[in-house]
């Protein structure tokens, strides 16, 4: 039985900081971001199913979200202004991501490869699944902006404005629900969110 470096690589996602060109009150790494995106994507899928007659596999959505940035362990987290500087750079970076995704999949033992390929290779998910993960990814970036702004860091003002436009372009009923029900709390203090739930 041969050894695989797959999970040793994924473990290093915690060493890759997001928002590298911006001053952060608290740094965020790709590993913790992936967990938050998985939780939010799962919630969006559950909301879609329960409230808006959707029929998506919420658990699969959570897993897709958990692995959505896995290739960054090989590529690093390219800052958004660089990644989308022009269409040629965006296209080339997509090609690099695809190569990195395949390299990760190839690290998995052959008898398990199809399971992980279905989670890491973004071309193996449906458009509906992809959109839910993209919504969750943008929502989590937006929540990071709210947290930084609430801590007095105006460095995130323009990012918040840009992400509001992104969220508007990806708008859905489940996202509207999430924004109305869950997002306002991110601008409150610990005391404020704990008032109604004493231990």
From Swiss-Prot:
Annotated function: Catalyzes the strictly specific dephosphorylation of 2'-deoxyribonucleoside 5'-monophosphates.
Amino acids binding substrate: 18-19, 33, 69, 77-80, 137
Chain residues that bind a divalent metal cation: 33, 68-69, 137
Top-level taxonomic group: Bacteria
Cofactor field: a divalent metal cation
Matches recorded under InterPro entries: HD/PDEase_dom, HD_domain, YfbR, YfbR/HDDC2
PROSITE patterns: HD
Reactions catalysed, as given in the entry: a 2'-deoxyribonucleoside 5'-phosphate + H2O = a 2'-deoxyribonucleoside + phosphate
Name of the protein in its database record: 5'-deoxynucleotidase Ent638_2835
Gene Ontology MF terms in the entry: 5'-deoxynucleotidase activity; metal ion binding; nucleotide binding
Subcellular location, record wording: Cytoplasm
Quaternary assembly: Homodimer.
Domain (HD): residue spans on this chain: 30-142
Record's signal peptide: none
SUPFAM superfamilies reported for this sequence: HD-domain/PDEase-like
GO cellular component, one term: cytoplasm
Pfam families per UniProt: YfbR-like
Family membership noted in the UniProt record: Belongs to the 5DNU family.
Keyword annotations of the record: Cytoplasm, Hydrolase, Metal-binding, Nucleotide-binding
């Amino acid at each position: 039985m041969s050894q695989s470096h797959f999970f040793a690589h994924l473990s290093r996602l915690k060493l890759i900081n997001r928002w590298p060109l911006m001053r952060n009150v608290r740094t965020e790494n790709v590993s913790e971001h992936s967990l938050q995106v998985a939780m939010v994507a799962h919630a969006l899928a559950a909301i879609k199913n329960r409230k808006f007659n959707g029929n998506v596999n919420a658990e699969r959505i959570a897993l897709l979200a958990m692995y959505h940035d896995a290739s960054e362990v090989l590529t690093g987290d390219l800052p958004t202004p660089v990644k989308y500087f022009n269409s040629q750079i965006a296209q080339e970076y997509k090609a690099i991501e695809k190569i990195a995704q395949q390299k990760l999949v190839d690290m998995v033992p052959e008898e398990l490869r199809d399971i992980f390929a279905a989670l890491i290779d973004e071309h193996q998910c449906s458009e509906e699944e992809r959109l839910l993960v993209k919504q969750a990814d943008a929502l989590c970036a937006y929540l990071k902006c709210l947290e930084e702004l609430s801590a007095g860091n105006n460095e995130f003002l323009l990012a918040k404005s840009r992400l509001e436009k992104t969220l508007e372009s990806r708008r859905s009923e489940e996202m509207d629900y999430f924004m109305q029900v869950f997002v306002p709390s991110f601008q409150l203090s610990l005391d404020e969110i704990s008032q109604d739930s004493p231990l």
